[in-house]
Amino acid sequence: MFHASADMLPSFVTVPLLVPTCPPPGFPRLLVNALTSVVGYVAVELRGAHSPDPLPSFTFDLSTRIKGNYIARAASWRQGGHFTQSLAGLAGKSVRVAARIPGAKVFSLTLECTAGKEVKSS
């Protein structure tokens, strides 16, 4: 495992990206194309377009760590007793994506609309 302070972990922050507005019943979500080592991971948080601070429901602490090899893995965050992929509350707004990537490579990030309703997992 990585035992470094969060400030020391490999990371990046994107330029502002527009979260799409999706026709019902779809919702916007963030897809990650990444490859991690056995102990590596990708953790994602969302920030305001012009702020270094994370958006309250989309912090690194609430992010599900992505581990493995994925072409299009949906990022998710813990909200209450379940995990959500939906960015519906951010539709039409610009956000910056911050990622911590110890032992990982991120090849692309995609903001997309889904075709159906979200099924929340616990």
Please name every model-derived segment:
Residues M1-S122:
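Beta-rich accessory regions
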